């Protein structure tokens, strides 16, 4: 008879521990999601401020960047070149906002997606605004910091047709 209360006490203790572990995992996931939203907002602010060094600093050393209508960049030099062109555009403005953050169960990998808006000045001097979406894959580094390992974006605007060559 004494084993039944002891067994029940053990079950209650085990269930309590399980609930604490589940709550802790949910809290950790929420903390990671918040941290990544904050990092993504800081990154957007750096790009909007045309701070090339800070903008590029969000990438991991082995990152790949896949801009629209261009080859992917797999070296920091190539990534820097892409961003140099973006931030150097006169009158350009760029911002983005995360709309979804998915964290892997392992807690060391996450996917951030959202929308962006970029305004550039065309050849006639008029502003042209592009809106689109993006996906980033973030990786937790050995030092505990999060860095973007893959970055791709594309426009919601219809593609422009290539110019037809004139007949002679």
Q: What are the functions of these language-model segments?
A:
Residues 30-37, 52-107, 115, 120, ...:
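A solvent-exposed, acidic/Ser-Thr-rich amphipathic alpha-helical stretch
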Residues 131-157:
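Short beta-strand edge/turn micro-motifs at domain boundaries
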Residues 103-110, 126, 139-145:
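A short, structured loop/turn motif at beta-sheet edges
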Residues 1-5:
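Positively charged n-region of N-terminal signal peptides that target proteins for export
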Residues 9-21:
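Bacterial N-terminal signal peptides
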Residues 20-61, 160-168:
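Short, low-complexity N-terminal intrinsically disordered segments enriched in polar/charged residues
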Residues 119-123, 156-158:
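Sequence/structural signature of outer-membrane beta-barrel proteins
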């Amino acid at each position: 008879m004494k084993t039944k209360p002891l067994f029940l006490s053990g079950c209650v203790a085990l269930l309590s521990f399980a609930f604490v572990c589940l709550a802790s995992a949910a809290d950790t996931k929420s903390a990671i999601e918040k941290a990544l939203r904050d990092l993504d907002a800081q990154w957007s602010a750096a790009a909007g401020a045309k701070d090339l060094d800070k903008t590029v600093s969000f990438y991991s050393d082995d990152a790949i960047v896949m801009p629209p209508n261009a080859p992917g960049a797999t070296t920091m030099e190539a990534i820097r070149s892409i961003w140099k062109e973006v931030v150097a555009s006169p009158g350009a403005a760029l911002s983005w906002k995360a709309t979804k953050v998915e964290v892997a169960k392992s807690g060391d990998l996450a996917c951030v997606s959202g929308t962006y808006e970029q305004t550039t000045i065309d050849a006639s001097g008029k502003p042209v605004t592009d809106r689109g979406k993006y996906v980033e894959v973030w990786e937790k580094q050995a030092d505990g910091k999060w860095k973007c390992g893959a970055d791709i974006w594309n426009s919601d605007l219809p593609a422009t047709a290539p110019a037809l060559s004139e007949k002679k």
